[in-house]
């Protein structure tokens, strides 16, 4: 009896210990969330003045952590190990709801994949012509080479995708922090002049209006919902009944890392410029690094900007691919199930990879202007799945009821509603 208890305790201790795979997933979560959008965040978040920026910095961790933890718990609440988000939705809310969420989940993740395919083609094309002084190959060939390169990693499976992302995080964070430190001597007091509750922001809106419209910027800057389902499934297979505790710990470390590195970079950029500079950068619709390179006449920043963007886009593309693949696979499986048919998962993954390769290549070649609008329309869907659906499940699903009664649940719902309302206001104003 004592031997059995001792072995059980030892087994629990080994499962509670931090593993190499935990570090890999922590960096994978970071890699999915922090994409090329971080290069626009100092402008979008800082243009409203210091007060909204400070409030957003305070809200960043709880907003990111509680929302993503809720979605992770939702995926883990399925009866059987190996169930992804689509299957858990169907289990809890029925076939119709499962089909709808699968469709919405795909159309929330997939357009972001298309945006990244266009972005990496534009960035490499610009880098070759401006920094390297080369004539880039025709857009169709260049985009095909880049997308095939990223899809080659996908071909080796989920573990390789997460591993590649975790490796790419190191140079990205390193360069981001070096840039933030490099800007410290340029810090000035101009941004601090906006530290007043009653002054109108540089955008022409009042403080609360500026803060309201800035919430979605923060939500999507730290969003990594497309990889959450794969993360939860992998950790449940690895840790069993201890998966929830382990996932919460990994999420916490990933989000602390996100908030500290990104907000340090944002504050360093904002403090090195004036509010007028930030407004000019927003007007020009260029990344903060492009503006800093021109502003401080620093060619080294001009060189670093596209390199950082390429790394950021690549790792985010890989993370969002997992979400888009899950959504596409879910739609195919549900469609076949309705006809009494099934498909082998490896075969389906190959079909999905081919579909993603062809469509991202076509879109990257054509570079359609409507893509930004499609991505924006996906915003409310992401916010609904990430913020509202898990909180609704806590009230309605017996397996989730143990998480009820926490003030953090109310906080997540409020932030979700604020984000969704602000997105719709921005769309139609």
What does each model-identified segment do?
Residues 26-32, 103, 128-157, 171-180, ...:
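Transmembrane alpha-helical segments of multi-pass small-molecule transport proteins
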Residues 120, 124, 140, 144, ...:
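Membrane-interface loop-to-helix entry segments
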Residues 1-43, 65-69, 397-403, 412-420:
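Membrane-interface "cap" regions at the ends of multi-pass membrane proteins
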């Amino acid at each position: 009896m004592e031997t059995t208890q001792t072995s059980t305790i030892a087994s629990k201790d080994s499962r509670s210990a931090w593993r190499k795979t935990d570090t890999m997933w922590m960096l994978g979560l970071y890699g999915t969330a922090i994409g090329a959008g971080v290069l626009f965040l100092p402008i979008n978040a800082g243009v409203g003045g210091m007060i909204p920026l400070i409030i957003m910095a305070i809200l960043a961790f709880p907003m990111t952590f509680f929302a993503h933890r809720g979605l992770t718990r939702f995926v883990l609440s399925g009866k059987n190990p190996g169930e992804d988000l689509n299957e858990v939705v169907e289990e809890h809310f029925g076939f119709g709801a499962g089909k709808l969420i699968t469709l919405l989940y795909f159309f929330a993740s997939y357009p972001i994949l298309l945006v990244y395919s266009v972005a990496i083609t534009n960035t490499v094309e610009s880098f070759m012509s401006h920094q390297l002084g080369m004539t880039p190959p025709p857009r169709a060939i260049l985009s095909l080479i880049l997308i095939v390169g990223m899809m080659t990693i996908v071909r080796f499976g989920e573990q390789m995708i997460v591993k590649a992302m975790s490796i790419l995080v190191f140079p990205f964070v390193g360069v981001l922090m070096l840039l933030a430190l490099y800007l410290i001597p340029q810090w000035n007091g101009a941004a601090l002049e906006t530290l007043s509750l009653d002054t109108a922001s540089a955008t022409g809106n009042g403080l609360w209006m500026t803060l309201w419209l800035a919430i979605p910027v923060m939500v999507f800057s730290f969003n990594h919902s497309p990889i959450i389902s794969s993360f939860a499934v992998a950790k449940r297979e690895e840790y069993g009944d201890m998966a929830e505790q382990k996932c919460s710990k990994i999420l916490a470390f990933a989000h602390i890392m996100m908030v500290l590195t990104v907000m340090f970079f944002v504050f360093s950029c904002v403090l090195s410029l004036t509010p007028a500079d930030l407004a000019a950068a927003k007007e020009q619709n260029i990344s903060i690094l492009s503006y800093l390179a021109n502003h401080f006449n620093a060619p080294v920043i001009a060189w670093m900007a596209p390199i950082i963007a390429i790394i950021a886009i690549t790792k985010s593309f890989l993370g969002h691919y997992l979400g888009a693949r899950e959504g596409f696979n879910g739609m195919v499986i549900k469609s076949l199930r309705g006809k009494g048919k099934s498909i082998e998962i490896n075969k389906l993954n190959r079909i999905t990879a081919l579909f993603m390769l062809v469509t991202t290549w076509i879109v990257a070649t054509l570079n359609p202007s409507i893509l930004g609008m499609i991505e924006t329309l996906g915003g409310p869907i992401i916010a609904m799945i990430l913020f509202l659906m898990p909180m609704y499940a806590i009230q309605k699903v017996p397996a989730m009821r143990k998480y009820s009664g926490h003030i953090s649940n109310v906080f997540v719902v409020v932030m979700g509603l604020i984000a969704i309302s602000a997105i719709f206001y921005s769309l139609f104003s």
